Amino acid sequence: GAVNEAAIRRQIRIMQDMGANTIRTSHNMPAPEYVRVADEMGMLLAVESFDEWAIPKVDNGYHLYFKDWAAKDLTNLVKHYRNNPSVLMWFIGNEVEEQSVENGSQVAYYLQNIVRALDPTRPISNGMDRPDDVLRNNMAATMHLVGFNYPPFKYQEAYCKLPQRLLLGSETASTLSSRGVYKFPIERKSMAKYPDMQSSSYDVEHCDWSNLPEDDWIHQEDLPYTIGEFIWTGFDYLGEPTPYYEEWPSHSSYFGAVDLAGLPKDRFYLYR
């Protein structure tokens, strides 16, 4: 098939060299080959299921199949991987639209119970990026392990309002950089653009909804109830060329600590 196990091993080895001990399989169910290699190499996994529930993000998304297939797909996922030692936790969603509706917590409860019935031993989380909404509709309170995508400055407020005693940075940073490109003056910027369509490797640039690595580290170090973070991302990937959404020829992300060729950026060494 299309899976190249040598490529998987190389990527995991690079992440281990950076110091990572866990990979989140965003935002879909991982290939069996990936999980097997993670088992062999000692890399832990947060196995994720869905990027969309019943409310659509896109016209041709999983919402078309959610009602009929969500329980079946989630059941198959957990049964398939629950005996793999690399699986550390489960994720039932990522930035779903149900975060902002009144019954969103009910859908989360439904999916979480499916997982819990099949595997009562592992934590279950959900990547939530709208803290105010999920605190209001109780989706955050419903989760076994609260996972917040971004706003680390919301952690303390959320902790005071939630029954759980732990918080996870389920998706963090989204710092922007291009390997070997350095922009002056060196200053923190949001959504900075340049004629060469690159981002500075000084790691001082981010999106208007994200932040720099040290912003997360401050909270991870100072708040005893935070248990770690999944940075976005380990590697650059095709698509989402923020902040150059429509400028040709940009077509890959700038988020990675490692570029598309597998070569470390400066941020790789910062994390290490």
Report each predicted region and the residues it spans.
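Extended substrate-binding grooves/exosites of carbohydrate-active enzymes
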Residues: 1-272
